[in-house]
Every structure is written in structure tokens, then in C-alpha cells.
Amino acid sequence: MRRRRLLALACVSATLLSGCSLLSSDDGDGRRTVTVWLMKSSASDDFLKRFTEDFEKTHSDLDLDIRIQEWTGIGEKVQTALKSDGGDEQPDVIEVGNTQVPQYAEGGKLEDLTLESMRDWGIRDWLPGLAEPGEYMSQQFGIPWYAANRVVIYRKDLFKEAGITSPPRTREEWITATEKLNQGGAQGIYLAGQDWYTLSGLIWDEGGELATGSGGAWTGALDSEEALRGMEFYQRLQKLGNGPVDADEEHPPQSGVFAKGRVAQIISVPGLATTILRENPDLKDKLGFFPVPGKTADKPGAVFTGGSDLVVPQNTDNRDGAIAVIEALAGAKWNTELARTMNYVPNKKSLAADVAGEEGVEAMAAGAAQGRATPSTPRWGAVEGDNPIKAYMTKVLNGADARTSAKEASRRITELLDPNTR
């Protein structure tokens, strides 16, 4: 509990005896300040200026103090803030990565926002890839703000050369098209062997999971039949290009590979096109985007959804103000405006049509409806740090037995999620 709250409670008691006036965190004019931590580059300066002006105009009792944070070291800084006893710089609202919510919610350090989510904020329409990791122990702590997910970036000119007139909509169409593209000195697709985010989507599309949880215990699940089918498709796709089997998409950066060679496709967030064009301006007007194809043409494939949620520290002394900020930032008006400004996907499936018109964002929004996130456990960070999924992928792509390798990787995931199994 924060110092200001304790002082205010003490003053309430003193009032009964001596007429002490209540302490408050207002600015002297009856307005209370809501301190908001947002991450660098999540929103433009112009957007934040317009939002602040509108919010303070429509909330006559509140002032906004938005403080921009760096991603480097943010985990430790947030944990410190959540344990603090107070101070005027203490945040009332914090932007966090969507998969980080459980580690902050553990131990009761965040406000439970389940009631507001169900009653006021349209929880059933939220993108699952943002909503699911925002839930911990059946309570909603993270409120979806914005999303970004992978699509296929492709060379329109190479598709035309190969006689492909429209992007594929199913996995089998995708394989057929990529086989046509993978000839004549061109790579059908550049897919690094350790792109586990893409593999995750293929596994989810098959009905599999990276890990399964029950009663707070988690078990690695890469050895399920569904997960093995996802890896099998990854193998088929990956061999239709020259991606390294022992590295991820950042080693080397796939934007540079795509920009400098005859590469027909990569899997990435649409924003990478800006980097590609900076490295090779000759590709202007030659880039296209389509959702990662699904098993059937009626819906895109599942994808890993990255993005941010908004949380309220349990030690805030201005819960009402924090709720008002989240209601505005995550509401339809400003959420759609943020998506248009920053080329994001809005937090609700019903808002996808509001960002139609930009090819990359449109493809991303279509895929986001099938978006997922990593298992909602505070210990998932340990899995990403050790990352037995990457090692498993490289083994299989080098010819190892998939089922045996998957069992080994699943066993390691279980150990990392539940140290008691060691």
C-alpha cells in the first residue's frame, strides 16, 4: 500500500479528534494526477499529445503524467515499482508486453480487472493473443492495447515471373506456389531454422500446444501428434529456400537477405518492409503482403501475437483514475486511432475493418483474429531464455527423429516450467 494512502487513512482518524484536513494527491486545484508508464516508440509524440489533451478535457478532475520507458531493464523497474510503498512518481497504469502479465500478477501485485473487462470493455471481442496472456489464475489483469503479428511479405515481381496471379490461401497452395518460386536462382522462401514463433503458429493451427497446464502445473507438449504435424509442415516449407537450420530470423537479419537477393517470401511483421526498402529502394512498389495461410481457405493460419497490455499496480492510490485512462486508451476511438497512426492491429476483432486500406495492416489484422500467445505462466521467460524449442528445430532439420527430439524438448520445457520435476 502506498504512503499517500496510509497518510490519508491516518488523517481520516485524526479528523474525528482534531479537525485534520484530508491529504490528497491532487495538484491543488482539485485535479488528481494519473501517472502512466508507456514504452518507447509504442505511440508517437503527436498521438500522445492529442490523447492527453482530449482526456484532460473530458475528465475535468484528472491530469495525465505520461512517462516514456525504455525496454532495456524494464522488467526489473516494473517489479521494483510494484513492490514500492509510494511516491509521486509511482505509476498508476503500466504498459507491459502481453506475455509478461503473469510474472507481474504473481503474488497479487496487480489489480484484478475482471469485472470491468466483462461488464464494460467487451472482453469477448478482444484478440485472443492479447487477452489470453493477460489472464492469470482465471482473473483478468492485463487489458489488451495493441497487437502486431507475422504475415508473409512477398515479391510481386517474382510471383508474376512464376505465373502466380494471387497469393495462396491454404497451406497446400502455399507449398505449391513456393515450389514454383524456388527455381531459376530464386529462393522460394527464406525461413530460418529456429524461427520458433512461426513454428508455434503451425502447431496451434494443428490443435497442438507448446505446453499444457492444469492446476498450476505445466508440461511440455511438443511431442503431441498435433505439434509433430506442425513441425512436419515447417520442414516442408523451410527446405524451399536457403535459410540456415541453426539460427533464427535475426542471425543474419532476414530483412537484409530479402533486400539483397532474389528471395520471394519471408515471414515477418509488416513493418519490416520499411527496413527492406531502406536497404533496397529498387523494391518500391514490388512488395506485397498476405496472411499466413491456414489449413483451409476460410480462415488464415494461427500466428503468434505480440503487443502490449495495460495493467494497474495493486499499490496505486488512484484506481479510479487508472481505470479511466485504460478505458480511454483501450476504447474504440483511441485504439483505432493508435492502430492507424502506428500500423498496429486494434485490440478487438470488430475493429479490424476500421484499419482496412493499408495492405500490410489489413493482412496482419486478418491473421490477428487467429492469434495466440505463449503459455500464461510466470515461468515462461525461463523457457525462452534456455529455448529448447530452437534446439529441437535444428535437430529435426538436420535429420534427427522428430518424435524422439520432441520428447527431449518437451521434457526440458517441463523442467523449466516446474523446477520440482528435476
Where does each model-flagged region fall?
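A structural signal for short loop-to-beta-strand junctions that line the ligand-binding cleft
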Residues: 83, 89-92, 120-158, 187-188, ...
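Hinge/lid segment of periplasmic solute-binding proteins
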Residues: 97-149, 175, 202, 288-290, ...
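Conserved C-terminal helix/tail region of periplasmic/extracytoplasmic solute-binding proteins
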Residues: 160, 369-422
